Swiss-Prot record:
Gene3D superfamilies: 3.10.170.10, Neutral Protease Domain 2. This is Extracellular metalloproteinase 3. The active site is at 430. It holds the Pfam family FTP. Residues 1-18 form the signal peptide. Binds 1 zinc ion per subunit. Its cofactor is Zn(2+).
């Protein structure tokens, strides 16, 4: 079925809503006693979006007969008529029809290495948008190639090795000329994975002047560096670029559900092996923004359906560190923080689910599946502060091969208004709709959770994962949790009862579904049962609150992650549009497949507690409950 399921956090219309943080990964150079952060390039870029670009180019003359590279070249010439530059040989037309052309500024025939101009051309051959970091100061009058009063490249290599304490032996280094102006490769070195290289280039400095430098390239494994060594003083290193990018996010860390549970912290390189291209690449293109193989995050204040040209925070050095405070208003004032948080939570959940088996062949959300099965080109499109609604969120799940779409709204239930992106449980709930709809009935069928009861379970799975992920080391089976409490500004949350193992606190039973007519109500019953199941497995296997599960022979070694794994495996086993009884049986079958039914009786006892025991029967109008256990338990 080539359908599309759109699932929301709440029933509409909505009336009055009466682990520890991850450790930072240290940069390898920092461990050598060198702070690479102090050598980062200065940010010089400006960007003119499509609206601004349309106004600027009205006065410019372009020929309809020009190809997109020629059109882009004319724009650069008209913008910087006195500058010299070259076309970089990497232009292409994207799948969205936008042509991308890049230019490098030059001086005296040498590249100004951090002076770039990028032009985007639309399908009609017109300038769509552009950005640049061209040098606008005074170019040195004297051509350095005339007197050649600059240092030897070998001295530059030795200067880089010394300044950065690199594990490269350069005592016997000799420079060999290679193709390109003042380009060299070093022979006689050891310690680098490939022969170091050097190119004579200019560099824009922070003070607005140009420095003549040797760009020394050294690949030492954990760091692949471009070190800009002053061409007149080899003791001076101006800047360093590391190809082995460390991304840093200032966010509410994984396991913190909302701002009441902690403060934003800086987290570096949080991806796992589940994202082999990191979070900022699809294996073909690296993105200095909140875009990658698994997700693309942006704001969407108009609530429109387009997204590719929407606003995203840009960070060439992948440092996404933006301010936020509980009193900040309106939410748009901290949109950079919001988009970053949404991107982080979405990717973190992707990686966790991947470890459980929601991979390429299972129909997960990725652009590049790396020849591992499934259909690619379907990352999750996640919109922060979406203007199409308030006090809710939703996720649209098309079949595998088409992107999922999450829309996160602002909440008007508090003053100042609150941003749903800052409550991880809401993001996780929405993404879980994509999980359950891709697994139930197979990746190509998005119509297998459309019945009332199966749709209810779709809501329940979202609440279950949101709650399981937020557990803390101090929690016990007596700990209760709400859903959506922070966003809704209501400690009881947005569900009829708290998630609790206590039958007085949460009295829902299987037969409670007989009187319920709305998927979120039914979902609360299902999530309540799964909450009991999780705590039963934690009591049987212990609990760990680390960010990532530990597996042995494919089995999570703690009860919390085991519950998440079994519940997910059950989704793929159950029939299209299942009922509670069938979903329970699928979880039992999942345990059989994974552990040879080692947890059979534990699972039965958890479900029997809520009336979904041995002998419970489904009838749309008159479900029969049972607290019994099967023979052998």
């Amino acid at each position: 079925m080539h359908g599309l399921l759109l699932a929301g956090l709440l029933a509409l219309p909505m009336n009055v809503l009466a682990h520890p943080a991850e450790q930072h990964a240290s940069n390898v150079l920092s461990r050598r006693g060198v702070d690479i952060e102090s050598f980062r390039l200065p940010l010089k870029a400006k960007y003119m979006d499509s609206d601004a670009a349309a106004q600027k180019i009205q006065a410019m003359s372009f020929s309809k007969d020009d190809d997109y590279v020629s059109t882009a070249t004319k724009l650069v010439k008209s913008t910087f008529p006195k500058s010299t530059f070259r076309v970089v040989d990497d232009h292409y037309t994207g799948t969205n029809g936008i042509g991308h052309v890049h230019f490098k500024q030059t001086a005296h025939g040498l590249d100004i290495d951090n002076s770039d101009f990028n032009v985007n051309i639309d399908r009609d051959g017109k300038v769509f948008s552009f950005g640049n970091s061209f040098f606008t100061g005074e170019i040195p009058k004297e051509n350095p190639m005339v007197k050649r009063a600059f240092s030897d490249p070998v001295k530059a290599l030795k200067g880089a090795v010394k300044a950065l304490n690199l594990p490269v032996k350069s005592d016997n280094a000799k420079a060999k000329t290679t193709a390109g102006k003042e380009s060299f490769e070093f022979m006689g070195t050891t310690g680098a994975l490939s022969a170091p290289k050097a190119n004579l280039v200019y560099l824009q400095k922070e003070d607005g002047t140009l420095a003549l430098t040797w760009r020394v390239e050294t690949d030492v494994g954990d760091n692949w560096l471009l070190t800009y060594v002053d061409a007149h003083n080899s003791e001076t290193v101006h800047n360093v670029v590391d190809y082995v990018a460390s991304a840093e996010f200032k966010v509410f860390a994984w396991g913190l559900n909302d701002p009441t549970e902690g403060n934003p912290t800086s987290i570096r390189d949080p991806w796992t092996d589940s994202s082999p291209y990191t979070w900022h690449s699809d294996g073909m293109t690296k993105y200095p923004t909140t875009r990658g193989n698994n997700a693309i995050a942006q704001d969407n204040p108009t609530g429109g359906s387009t997204y590719i040209n929407n606003y995203r925070p840009q960070s060439p050095n992948l440092i996404f560190n933006y301010p936020w405070s509980p009193t900040a208003t309106p939410p748009s004032s901290y949109k950079d923080f919001s988009i970053t948080q949404l991107f982080y939570t979405t990717n973190r959940f992707h990686d966790l689910l991947y470890s459980f088996g929601f991979n390429e062949a299972a129909g997960n959300f990725q652009v590049n599946n790396g020849n591992k099965g499934g259909r690619g080109n379907d990352f999750a499109i996640v919109n922060a502060q979406d203007g199409s609604g308030t006090n809710n969120a939703n996720f649209a799940t098309p079949p595998d091969g088409s992107p999922g779409r999450m829309r996160m709204y602002n909440w008007t239930t508090a003053r100042p208004n609150r941003d749903g992106c800052l409550e991880a449980g809401i993001v996780i709930h929405e993404y879980a709709h994509g999980l359950s709809n891709r697994l139930c009935g197979g990746p190509a069928n998005s119509g297998c959770l459309n019945a009332l009861e199966s749709g209810g379970m779709g809501e329940g799975w979202g609440d279950f994962y949101a709650t399981a992920i937020r557990l803390k080391p101090r929690d016990t089976k007596d700990t209760n949790y709400s859903m959506g409490a922070w966003a809704a500004n209501n400690p009881k949350g947005i569900r009829a009862y708290l998630y609790s193992t206590n039958l007085q606190t949460n009295p829902y039973m299987y037969t409670s579904v007989n009187s319920l007519r709305e998927v979120h109500q039914i979902g609360t019953v299902w999530a309540t049962m799964l909450y009991d199941l999780m705590w039963a497995l934690i009591e049987a296997h212990g609990g760990t609150y680390s960010a990532n599960p530990v597996f042995r022979n494919g089995v999570p070694q703690d009860g919390r992650h085991l519950a998440m794994k079994l519940v997910m495996d059950g989704m793929a086993l159950q029939p299209c549009n299942p009922n509670f009884v069938q979903a329970r049986d699928a979880i039992l079958d999942a345990d059989r497949a994974l552990t040879n039914s080692a947890n059979k009786c534990t699972i039965w006892k958890a479900f029997a507690k809520r009336g979904l025991g041995y002998g419970a029967k489904y009838d749309a109008r008159n479900r029969t409950g049972s607290n019994r256990l099967p023979p052998g338990c």
